[in-house]
Each structure stands twice: as structure tokens, then as C-alpha cells.
Amino acid sequence: MKASEVIANLQRRFPNEPEYIQAVSQVLGTIEEEYNKHPEFEKANLIERLCIPDRIIQFRVSWVDDKGNVQTNMGYRVQHNNAIGPYKGGLRYHKSVNLGILKFLAFEQTFKNSLTTLPMGLSLIHI
């Protein structure tokens, strides 16, 4: 599958995650020409394996606010890629953070870690 096909496929699969799609599109746009020169990359499904997180854990967090009311929020843990080492974690606490943003942050941090030769993958948590 060519890089442009992967992007189109991701847009169909994750239409409500524009931050994630934008990050993947930008990275794939910069490597597409070189990627297309190597049919072995396509045979190994390299781009999809790199772009789609290894796992996403979704969970509920219930808590009591200052007025004594029970609130419920959703939490997410995105374990993006552990190809070069164990998952490295990070936390985000803000009402504006969503799964698409976490996938975007995890995707980009995976590249930062690999480019700086840090022997770790990436995982982010949002509550």
C-alpha cells in the first residue's frame, strides 16, 4: 500500500481524529518518495505498522468534586510503538485532550525518541 493510500485509509478509519491524521500525513508526505522506491517496505506493511498504535486502553475514572458530586471522565492510554524499547509514558490532564490528540502526540514522540537514539517507545495517558 502506497503512503497516500495509507493516509486515505486512516482518514476513513479515524474520521474524528484530525490531529492524528494531520501528523501522520505530514510525516508520510516527507518520506513518501523514498518509501515508494522500496517495495520491501510495502511488503512488510511498514507504514501502517508504524502509524497505528500498538494498543489503546480506554477506561473510566470516577471522582468526587468539591461539591460532593460524583463525576465520570474517560481516560486513555496510547501505547504507540515499542520497537526500540519499552513504552515511555506521559500524562495529560485537560478537558480538551481527546484520543486523536494523544495518538498525534504519541506518534510524534516515537520519532523524537528514535531520532535522539533514546532506547524507548512511547505511551501517553489522558484522564
Each predicted region: which residue ranges?
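Glycine-rich phosphate/ribose-binding loops and adjacent secondary-structure elements
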Residues: 2
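Ordered core of a single globular domain
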Residues: 8, 12-30
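Active-site-adjacent core segments of small-molecule enzymes
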Residues: 11-17, 43-49, 65, 92, ...
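Flexible, glycine/charged-enriched surface loops at secondary-structure junctions
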Residues: 21, 37-44, 117
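Structured beta-strand/loop patches that form or line metal/cofactor-binding pockets in enzymes
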Residues: 40-69
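N-terminal cap/recognition module
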Residues: 69-110
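Short, flexible active-site-proximal loops enriched in glycine and acidic residues
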Residues: 111-121
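Conserved small/polar residues in nucleotide/adenosyl-binding loops
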Residues: 126-127
